Amino acid sequence: MYTLADAAGWYFLAPLFGAVAAVGFLFIIVILEALVLRGLKWGSLKLSFVDSAVINLTSGFVGALLFAFSAPLVNQGTAFLLLVFGALTVLIEGGMLTLLQRHPARQTWTAAIAINVVSYAFLFVVVVGILRL
């Protein structure tokens, strides 16, 4: 079972905790990223939340597809996987934010990097700090 939360959530959290935790993790990530978007003056809190939900569902879906075909990556270690999935998530979510055409490219890609630094820092704390994976 896999989660719908960023590309890395598919690998790290769902196999351990199941669907309920997966949905909870998605909700936490959407809220964290919406707050970062709001802090970056992306738009209203509602718009930031909607955009965060859209991009996270998209990156989660794409992450699941990529993960299904990336068996050789599984044995590379936690840090490597966080780096790979983090980079993919920035590209996917930055691309989605670009397609929404709400802001200039520089602001869009700054937002994509910032929201993922926050969400992957959270994921790192959960996976490495708490779960010790």
Language model segments and positions:
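Juxtamembrane/disordered regions of integral membrane proteins
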Residues: M1-L133
